[in-house]
Amino acid sequence: MGQSSVAQFASELGLPAELLLEQLRGAGVNKTAYDDVLTEQDKTSLLEYLRKEHGVQEPKNKITLTRKQVTEIKKSDSSGKARTIQVEVRKKRVLVRRDPALEPVVAEESAEIAPAAVIDEPTLQAAPVVLPEPEPVVEAVPEPVAVEQELESEPEPTVAPAEPEAGEVAVAVDEKPTADARPKLTARELLGAEELALREREAKRQAALMAIQAEELRKKQELAQRRQEEAKRAAEAAANKLSEGTLHKPVAKEAPKPEEKNAKKTGKSGGKDWNDSDGKKRGGVKGRSDAGVAGQGWRAKGSKSKSKNNENQQHAFTAPTEPIVHDVLVPETITVGDLAHKMAVKASEVIKTLMKMGMMVTINQVLDQETAIIIVEEMGHNAKAAASNDPEAFLDEAEHAEAVQEPRPPVVTVMGHVDHGKTSLLDYIRRSRVASGEAGGITQHIGAYHVETPRGMVTFLDTPGHEAFTAMRARGAKATDVVILVVAADDGVMPQTIEAVHHAKAANVPIVVAVNKIDKPEANPERVKQELVSHEVVPEDWGGDTMFVEVSAKTGAGIDNLLEAVLLQAEVLELKAPKNIPAKGLVIEGRLDKGRGPVSTILVQSGTLQRGDMILAGTAYGRVRAMLDESGRDVKEAGPSIPVEILGLSDVPSAGEEVIVLNDERKAREIALFRQGKFRDVKLAKQQAAKLESMFEQMGEGEVKVLHLIIKSDVQGSYEALSTSLQKLSTDEVKVNIIHTGVGAISESDVNLAAASKAVLIGFNVRADAGARKLIESTGVDVRYYNIIYEAVDEVKAALGGMLSPEQKENVIGTVEIREVFRISKVGSVAGCYVQDGVVRRNSKVRLIRDNVVIHTGELDSLKRFKDDVKEVKSNFECGLSLKNYNEIEVGDILEVFEVVEVARTL
């Protein structure tokens, strides 16, 4: 039907005629009366207008149903603890109603519009709704009711690919044929050729997509079937392997096919157990007939059900035939449980291996990297040392390669043997009196000074010469450009002189030798040169490359020549450093000041350190609150090669740590805390290893006496040197155990720790505060104060010697000749003797010698002279004596009388 009136078209659509006229006017079709004729052009214009008005992208007659299901699963983490994880599954389903405008429309006005029929054309199946109406009058079909019936009863709907993204489920609706047989509008008449072509292409795309999905589903099913067959064959092989060597006759009947299993589910024998099918509740006692059947339940009987159970309950997992070798990345510290997890073995296996290697460990014990690598290789895996995920790796990013390099003053370290005049030499250069202020006249700290000379600025580092300060001297050589080796002309080359040469050569630093004390009459500079040549330090006038300068720190002779030699050596090195960048440097020394907190001596090596900078030094960080030079004057900035004291760090840094300026306080705190944790883990692992080693040593050697010490000093380098020297005093019988070392005054916590651990408190250049002194009086803790390292080492050495068990020594006190032997019943043999020399005492120990051979060693039982018991008989007197429990005495025997005395031992 090509044309119809407005009233007829309104009745066909089920709309009021007035509403249709309004929509036509909105579409630009000028119709005013109900009898006006509508052409195909007018209907197309109306359709396009309605599409533009309501849009076709989001059809109104579409319902999206979402379903959310939350379940919980239990999963174990790397440490073996079970954790509950919530899993949320969301499903989305889209129900679409077909638009009545796309189907043949019934022209009867009074009849209700029935639900749309199942559409067979593929173009209409994939089509979206064309005419959604905003008014409730337009939709005569009760859509929500139809959807609820669809969800509740769920008849078999016809699936049509309406929207591939959402769920591709459409509502199937039935067609009710009406009695009126009026002409109908077809979809081809309502839709243009372009729209139909578009829908055909969409239908073809949907068909191709469904074909691809069907092919993928088929492949997945084939793969699953293939895996099931492989698992079945593996299960049969395992069952055959288990049945080998049994006494019963093997089951000859083949396993039933999968089709037969479903058919025999309800038989008497019952393919599956009605209760406890997997045998978890009861293991059951296997008889001889059950030996070849794996995985059966406890109700299974007979060979028929055995083979059936074997198929149904055989797990698909097959054990690997070869050992799996893992590549294990081992960090610096790792617990036993984590190491087992990385190797995919039980923690008990790792503990067993460690016990075989002589280590008693627990699952949470921390192992160091070296031990963990040995364990991994012992268990047949490949161990690799893991690169640490250190946040300080980002510190190298801020390299300032474009910074201008400027000349800087040389850093000169003065090294040499103790009492050879290092500090006195510096005193003359600085025109100060430092050596007289040092305890005992020896240097026990690194002193850093910068000196203005007529030839330029020089920074001096004065190091201790005592043997205990090896680590300090090594730090001084590391931070320096030139080493002045001070050798006394009257003393020559000594052990610490040789050690200083080794430190300088290890750091690849040039040496200038200062032969000191040439003003003494016994000075012999040539001997110094000869002794140093044997240690590869050859003077220039002997064809070498080392400058020798003869000086006197007392008279000042040769000091100018020494400075000239040092500056000449520095010019050869062409020392340069950038100045206008964030500073980097080295911690020379650190101490805890009671009023100012942690104080650190820092040598700036590059850049400029300013007040207010955020710095990181090892495990300490903080903002520079104040900077002081070596004279105690306040400075605002310090350039390269300038030593300064800084205040404001969170803790006392370790000497030798690198100092770096950071812009971000948060990053500085993060790196410092990371270093603290790493240091603590490594220290704990080493302590544990040391405890185990000492435990096995004690088991082998018996009880070892231990002297517990707590050391507090004024600076970090002092307690480092003191603890190293004291630990060297340990022997196999007595050991020094340093429980705690620290910087600062002795506090109450130190006293409490000493009281709990029965330790001796040593204060080196520090004293106890008021609260600690009261606690010391009440607890009776032994506290010793020292200013010189010699005295501390000597007293601890004496204390260790007192702890040694005394040595027993035999002391011969007399010799007795037996001249007559009397045999007395009830008494035994009594000897008449003559004391040749010495003295004989009652209850002394004697040694019986016959023909110069010791026959018996024992004690005197009685000693008499003229029938009287006496305590002792001196030489040239006669006496009678008897031996305890020994009667084989002959005339002519010699008795050697001796006493056992205890002699105190020393280290």
Swiss-Prot record:
Region labeled G1 — which residues?
Answer: 416-423
One Pfam annotation, family name?
IF-2
What is its biological role?
Answer: One of the essential components for the initiation of protein synthesis. Protects formylmethionyl-tRNA from spontaneous hydrolysis and promotes its binding to the 30S ribosomal subunits. Also involved in the hydrolysis of GTP during the formation of the 70S ribosomal complex.
- Compositional bias, Basic and acidic residues, is annotated for 223-235, 251-263, 270-281
According to the UniProt record, one GO cellular component term is: cytosol
Gene3D superfamilies per record: P-loop containing nucleotide triphosphate hydrolases (3.40.50.300), Putative DNA-binding domain, N-terminal subdomain of bacterial translation initiation factor IF2 (3.30.56.50), Translation factors (2.40.30.10), Translation initiation factor IF- 2, domain 3 (3.40.50.10050)
The cysteines joined by S-S bonds are: none
Q: Does this entry carry the keyword Repeat?
A: no
Start and end residues of each stretch annotated as G2: 441-445
Q: Where is this region: Disordered?
A: 223-320
Which species expresses this protein natively? Methylobacillus flagellatus (strain ATCC 51484 / DSM 6875 / VKM B-1610 / KT)
Q: Which GO terms describe its molecular function?
A: GTP binding; GTPase activity; guanosine tetraphosphate binding; translation initiation factor activity
Q: Region G4: start and end of each range?
A: 516-519
Similarity field? Belongs to the TRAFAC class translation factor GTPase superfamily. Classic translation factor GTPase family. IF-2 subfamily.
Q: Which UniProt keywords apply?
A: Cytoplasm, GTP-binding, Initiation factor, Nucleotide-binding, Protein biosynthesis
Annotated signal peptide? none
Q: Where in the cell is it found?
A: Cytoplasm
Location of the tr-type G domain: 407-576
Question: What ranges does the record give for the region G5, renumbered to this chain?
Answer: 552-554
Protein's UniProt name: Translation initiation factor IF-2
Database matches in HAMAP family: IF_2_B
- Annotated GTP binding lies at 416-423, 462-466, 516-519
Record region (G3): 462-465
Grouped into one coarse class, the protein's main location is cytoplasm
